[in-house]
């Protein structure tokens, strides 16, 4: 059986979906040329180009909001926040917009997007880069 890291498995899964569906794209801080904070998207910009692997400004609210907005138009974004701690900054877009939009529009709107947030990284990255807030998204 082949052994790979979580980062490699995530990269393979994202690439597989991007090959399968041209509406899937990746956006987030440093996901393009740099390959993401933990190297998960290394090389993806070479295969899929800047239109589908998009570096964003350091604004978690914009990343989540752009993902939700583009998902409603038929795109299938994979939005990466550099650390789960910063999902708190994006909660309006996640909780009040993306999570409720289908119901606010009587089932006519769909918001298919993936939000990736590395959590509890174990890198000694201090108090604002080490929380594990997964339970917030499980209910």
Where are the language model's segments positioned?
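Thiamine diphosphate
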Residues: 1-139
């Amino acid at each position: 059986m082949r052994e790979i890291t979580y980062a490699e498995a995530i990269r393979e899964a994202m690439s597989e979906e991007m090959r399968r569906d041209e509406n899937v794209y990746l956006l987030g801080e440093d996901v393009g040329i740099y390959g993401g904070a933990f190297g998960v998207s290394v090389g993806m910009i070479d295969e899929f180009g800047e239109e589908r692997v998009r570096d964003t400004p350091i604004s978690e609210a914009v990343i989540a909001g752009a993902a939700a907005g583009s998902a409603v138009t038929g795109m299938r974004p994979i939005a990466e926040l550099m650390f789960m701690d910063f999902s708190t900054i994006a909660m309006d877009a996640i909780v009040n917009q993306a999570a409720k939009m289908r119901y606010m529009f009587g089932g006519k709107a769909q918001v298919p997007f993936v939000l990736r947030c590395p959590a509890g990284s174990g890198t000694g990255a201090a108090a604002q880069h080490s929380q594990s807030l997964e339970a917030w998204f499980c209910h």
